[in-house]
Regions:
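N-terminal active-site segment of His-dependent metallophosphoesterases
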Residues: 1-38
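Hydrophobic/aromatic beta-strand patches that form the interior of the parallel beta-sheet core
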Residues: 7-9, 40, 128, 217, ...
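A generic structural motif
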Residues: 12, 53, 159, 249, ...
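Cys-nucleophile CN-hydrolase/nitrilase-fold catalytic domain and related Cys-dependent amidase chemistry
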Residues: 17, 29-149, 222-224, 228-236
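Catalytic metal-binding/acid-base residues of hydrolase active sites
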Residues: 45, 132-133, 200, 221-223, ...
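Active-site catalytic loop in hydrolytic enzyme cores
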Residues: 105-118, 122-125, 133-215, 219-233
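Short beta-strand scaffold segments in enzyme catalytic cores
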Residues: 129-131, 141-145, 178-179, 244, ...
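C-terminal beta-strand edge segments of enzyme domains
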Residues: 247-397
Length: 397
C-alpha cells in the first residue's frame, strides 16, 4: 500500500489578496518539490484573520471608522461565484459542478476559484485552504478542497463563528459539512474540515466521523497550548489522521518589525530547487530544520559564533524574522496519527517552513479494531444524530 505525504505550514496572510494567492502558488510549488500530496493552509488565510480588530463595534453602537475598516476587509474577501443559499449553505453540488444559472459556461465570481484550481493543477498538490468568502453582502469563513485533477471538489462555511467573529462573519449551513473523497496512488482518502472552535463542538465532530472520513482537517486561529491536545484527542476519537494549520504572525512594532530577507533558494517552473548565493550582509540562519520525516532538528552553533551556511531538506528558507520578535499568533501547525501521536510539528514561530509526514491510511482501519466512533461504538440504536440538509451516509474506503 502506498504511503501518502501529508503537509502543512504556518504562513501569514499577505497585505493584498493577490499577494496571498501568489504565496499559495509559491508554497504549492515548494510542497510539490517536497513530494507533498495534500497540503493544508490556515483558517481565513485568503482574506485574513482580523485578530484584535473591533470594527468600531460596541453594544448599541458602531463607528464610522469601524464601518470603513469593515469595507476594506470586505474588499479583501474573495467571490467564488456561489450563492447565499438556504441558511448560508450556498448552492452545494450545483456550485461544485458549475450548474448555477442557465448557462454553465458563464464564469461566476472574481476568478479566485479558477486561479486556485490552476495552482493545484500546475503543482499536482491537493490543496485545502481557509478563505474569507463574500456573497450576497455577507462574509463567510470558508474552506475549499482543491483537487489537482478535478478542481474544487467542495467548499464549506463555518457554521458558528466564535465570539466577536460573529460581528463580521455570517453563519454557514451545516449542509456544507459534506465530506469529499479523492484517490491518490490507489489510496482512497475521505476528508473533511472543522474550522477552529468548531472542533470543540462534539456533534460536529461526530458529523464528520459519521461520513467515514480518514483525514480530518483543522484549519484554525487558535495558538493556545491546549489546541494540540484537542487534535490528539480527535485523532484517537475518530481513528483518523489529523492535520491542523495556523498562521505564525509577528507583531509589527517599531522595536519588532519583520525584516523580509531574500530566500536561500528558488523553485523553477519545473519544480527544481536552485540555490542562491549567500549575501555577505546576512549573518543569521535558522536554528532548526526538518528532516524527510517532518521531524524538527535543532542545529548547533559554531564555537566562534559564525553560523555558516545552512543546508536543509526539504527546501527551507533563511528566517525572515528577527530573534527578539513578539508574536500576534505563534502558529503551531501539526500532524497527528489515528493513535494520537504527533508525527510532525507543532510548528511554532515559523511562517516560512513546511512540515510533513508520510502516512499509511490503513492505520485508520487498524485502529478501528477497538474503536469506531461512527460504527458500532456510536450505539446508534440508542443515540440519534441528524444534521439539517446533510445525509450522514458513510463514504467507502
Amino acid at each position: 500500500m502506498s504511503t501518502i505525504r501529508l503537509g502543512t505550514a504556518s504562513p501569514g496572510t499577505q497585505p493584498t489578496t493577490a499577494a496571498t494567492i501568489a504565496l499559495i502558488d509559491s508554497i504549492a510549488q515548494r510542497a510539490a518539490s517536497s513530494k507533498i500530496d495534500i497540503l493544508l493552509l490556515p483558517e481565513a488565510f485568503i482574506g485574513g484573520y482580523p485578530r484584535g480588530s473591533s470594527f468600531g463595534c460596541q453594544i448599541g453602537g458602531r463607528s464610522e471608522e469601524g464601518r470603513e475598516e469593515f469595507a476594506k476587509y470586505f474588499d479583501q474577501a474573495i467571490d467564488l461565484g456561489d450563492t447565499v443559499g438556504p441558511g448560508g449553505g450556498g448552492a452545494g453540488l450545483k456550485w461544485v459542478k458549475r450548474q448555477i444559472g442557465d448557462d454553465s459556461d458563464v464564469v461566476r465570481g472574481d476568478g479566485s476559484r479558477e486561479e486556485l484550481e490552476r495552482i493545484a493543477r500546475d503543482s499536482g498538490v491537493f490543496i485545502v485552504t481557509g478563505c474569507i468568502e463574500k456573497t450576497g453582502g455577507s462574509l463567510y469563513c470558508s474552506v475549499v478542497y482543491v483537487c489537482p485533477k478535478e478542481g474544487m471538489l467542495g467548499k464549506r462555511r463555518k457554521v458558528l463563528p466564535t465570539g466577536s467573529e460573529r460581528l463580521i462573519w455570517a453563519q454557514g449551513a451545516p449542509s456544507t459539512l459534506r465530506a469529499v473523497s479523492t484517490i491518490i496512488r490507489g489510496v482512497r482518502i475521505n476528508l473533511a474540515a472543522a474550522i477552529c472552535w468548531e472542533n470543540y463542538m462534539p456533534l460536529l465532530r461526530q458529523t464528520l466521523y459519521s461520513q467515514n472520513i480518514n483525514l480530518y482537517l483543522a484549519p484554525t486561529a487558535d495558538n493556545r497550548d491546549a489546541w494540540l491536545g484537542l487534535m490528539r484527542t480527535v485523532g484517537v476519537e475518530g481513528r483518523c489522521f489529523v492535520v491542523s494549520s495556523n498562521m505564525a504572525v509577528p507583531k509589527e512594532t517599531s522595536e519588532s518589525l519583520p525584516k523580509r530577507r531574500r530566500r536561500d533558494s528558488t523553485i523553477t517552473e519545473e519544480g527544481f530547487e536552485i540555490a542562491l548565493p549567500r549575501s555577505p550582509q546576512r549573518a543569521r540562519r535558522r536554528k532548526s530544520v526538518f528532516d524527510e520525516d517532518g521531524n524538527e532538528i535543532v542545529l548547533c552553533r559554531d564555537v566562534d559564533g559564525d553560523d555558516g551556511d545552512t543546508q536543509t531538506s526539504p527546501p527551507v528558507f533563511t528566517s525572515t524574522i528577527p530573534e527578539k520578535t513578539e508574536w500576534i499568533s505563534r502558529g503551531g501547525s501539526s500532524i497527528v496519527s489515528p493513535y494520537g501521536d504527533v508525527v510532525a510539528g507543532p510548528q511554532w514561530e515559523d511562517p516560512d517552513g513546511l512540515i510533513y509526514s508520510d502516512v499509511d491510511f490503513r492505520d485508520c482501519i487498524r485502529g478501528r479494531l477497538d474503536l469506531d466512533a461512527a460504527g458500532s461504538y456510536s450505539r446508534n440504536d440508542s443515540f440519534k444524530l441528524s444534521v439539517e440538509g446533510l445525509e450522514l451516509d458513510p463514504l467507502p474506503y
